[in-house]
Amino acid sequence: PKVLRNTELLYDDDIALAVAEMGFHGMLTEGAKHVLGWKSPDFVYQSAVVPELHLLMRHAALSEDLSRRFCDQSWDEYPLTADKYASWLADRGKGEQVTYLDMSYDVLGNLCPASSGIFDFFRALPEYIDRAGLEMATPSEVFGQLRPEDEISVLDTISWSEEEKTTKSWLGNILQQEAFGKLVEWTERTRMSGNRRIKQDWAYLQSSDHFLYMSTAMENKDSGLYSPYGSPYDAFNNYMNVLSDFHLRVEEEYPSSIENEELNALLKTIENQGEEITALQEELHKLRAEKPAKRTGTTKKAK
């Protein structure tokens, strides 16, 4: 893969550096107004800190016409038809290159049930896009065909969440910050583990949804919409109990009485010794293969 879509479209200059170092050539993120200013999201941009990393900025309004407003009967554009939507896409400003749409799969049958016509809308949309003289393309195709219009610098992390487009939905209150802080505390020790199940559970614990469910922001519609918990406090208590159990499992493997640096040095020594043993075994096998086989035979006994 050459293009990265980060969770919740999270992006900033530090993330850009890490993503480019991983070998990606492009990234998808949010067309946040406070980042773009007077610029349109309908162009290819490049990172200000890594110019070779090209960016597509989500068109929030057109994306949320589908993800948030399609089923809203109080919306003045309701009902939204495929031909109407295609005409909106075609009415972009002159000279604009590309419109990047991004939404959760939940819009298909969950946020908008089949009875809303959402599936019929998407079945019909490609035909009306073609009639409007537009074409669809993958991010890699877009980056291969279009040159960046300008550079984008993002010092503070942006996302596609709510009006502020920040990380507030996941790290905005003391519950979320406490849970995340405890998770991060065990990063190095967990990385040292050779237990695949522990590393798998560690990845599960990093899911952004766990922290979204702890949101207490009244304006955060997604938290209450998706959360299986009765309250943010229930979500916090459940997560901390699971995290505590996880810590005990890691503790059994690598006791916290041993400092991370000391433990890392011990593991490195064991790894080096293992490599030395493997090399010696290979050398022994080679010597055995080169040693001439002992000749055997029978002689006739003299009479």
PLM region descriptions:
Residues 3, 26, 98-100:
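Residues at the N-termini of beta-strands
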Residues 12-22:
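Distinct, well-ordered alpha-helical segments
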Residues 20-41, 46-54:
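Acidic, His- and aromatic-enriched active-site or binding-groove loops in soluble protein domains
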Residues 1-7, 66-81, 109-116:
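The substrate-binding groove and active-site-proximal loops of carbohydrate-active enzymes
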Residues 4-11, 140-142:
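Short, solvent-exposed turn/loop segments enriched in Gly/Ser/Thr/Pro and often Arg
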Residues 43-53, 57-58, 72-75, 87-295, ...:
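Active-site and substrate-binding clefts of carbohydrate-active enzymes
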Residues 5-9, 29-31, 57-58, 102-104:
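Short His-Asn-centered micro-motif
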Residues 29-38, 56-77:
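Positively charged, amphipathic and often flexible ligand-engagement surfaces
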